[in-house]
Amino acid sequence: MTYEPVSLATALASFSQVWSPRIVTTVNDYDVRVAKVEGEHLWHVHDDTDEFFLVLAGELHIALREEAGERTVRLPRGSVFTVPRGTEHKPYAPVPTEILLLEPTGTSTVGDRHEEVPDHVDATTGHALG
């Protein structure tokens, strides 16, 4: 990894796949990833880590299954949200959306436990830019 400025717009323009994040940089032992998303992801859980979302463009909804029941958070452009570790969640983008994620290096996009992975979701720990 080189330590040079990275344009998020350029990074996002470098790929077209949805639900297939690219690693733009690392901070300590965390990846900073960008992704294009649209439609549904899948229900999944990260047992040992929180998951941070920043909506750069579009709108992201995250369905959550919590002790008190199910709820959905709506994140318009410019919003952030952290899904706590151990919380089952399912992201959904009703329109083409661009997001930034912060999670420990090596964290799978489908978590530690998940339902069947649909063809349009890339089960990965992130791809290098370029």
Residue spans of the language-model regions?
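Histidine-centered metal-chelating micro-motifs
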Residues: L42, S79-K90, T97-I99, T107
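A short glycine-rich, His/Asp/Glu-containing loop-to-beta-strand
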Residues: L8-W43, T49
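Short acidic-glycine-tyrosine-enriched beta hairpin
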Residues: E66-R85
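Double-stranded beta-helix
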Residues: T2-L12, T25, P94-G130
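His/acidic/aromatic-lined binding-pocket segments of jelly-roll/cupin-type domains
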Residues: W43-V45, D50-V55, T72-V73, K90-P91
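Structural motif
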Residues: D31, E40, F52, E59-H61, ...
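Short, conserved beta-strand element in jelly-roll/cupin
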Residues: K36-V37, H46-E66, L102
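A cytosolic small-molecule/anion-sensing beta-strand core signal
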Residues: N28, L56-A57, P76-R77, V95
